[in-house]
Amino acid sequence: MLLLDYDGTLAPFHVDRSLAYPYHGVVSLLDNIMRCGKTRVIIISGRPIVELRTLLTPMSDLEMWGSHGLERQLSDGSYSRVQVGEEDAASLTEAEEWVVAAGLLSRAEIKLGGIAIHWRGLPPAEARKVQALTQEGWGPLAERSGLKLLQFEAGLELRVSHPDKGDAVRAILADLDTEVPIAYLGDDLTDEDAFQVLEGRGLSILVRAAYRETIARAWLRPPQELIAFLEQWRSDVGG
């Protein structure tokens, strides 16, 4: 089984998130791996599933967990989602109101179960200003509400504490034979939850140009080492 984060793992970051398409060769490799019939391929991302569908259009039968596990699309196209609790929803509404008042709406991404502020593409001084302002505005709200304030590559996200990517992996493992080999590839701090769940069960791989502290067992630098890993997997399953 192959579990894959999207942004920063299968695709390079892009100022315009709608243009963050996979690295060249990734889609065809994943398609080949799936067609062999020996590997279940699953995307686990913070992105909404509707965006993943667009960016991975050729792979319409791909299983996806979106919004950190709040949404799920099976390979047959069936879709389900977890409802956000009333208290969390009220806290997220408060966070959105703060975004508007702070003049950061153009930098905001409002999504199921969370709100993200992006500063990719800004000059360094302005990016630091946006980061500090967001931290100052959302930090107290996170502390009193129980929401998670998470830093990712060039942004901060305030979101519900559960489910997270670790919960998604845990749910997948619950229906999986313990003898099935499994690997999870991810790049940022939200993937650490998934790495932790895989401890003693599968291979956790950090995919990132520059190494950072992680509990992952291996490190790949994209795109070359990522492509080489997928090519080896394809070869191993007979593709």
Question: How would you describe each model-predicted region?
Answer:
Residues 67, 74-90, 144, 150-178:
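Substrate-recognition "cap/lid" segment bordering the active-site pocket of phosphatases
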Residues 21-111:
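Active-site phosphate-binding/coordination module
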Residues 8, 64, 117, 169, ...:
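Residue-level signal for inorganic ion chemistry
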Residues 106-124, 146-159:
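Charged, glycine-interspersed solvent-exposed loop segments at helix/strand-loop junctions
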Residues 40-42, 63, 148, 183, ...:
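A structural signal for isolated positions on well-ordered beta-strands in alpha/beta enzyme cores
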Residues 166-239:
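Mg2+-dependent phosphoryl-transfer enzymes with acidic/Ser/Thr/Gly-rich catalytic loops
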Residues 47-67, 125-146:
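Substrate-recognition/cap helix-loop segment adjacent to the acidic, metal-dependent catalytic center
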Residues 1-16, 43, 169:
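Asp-based phosphoryl-transfer active-site loop
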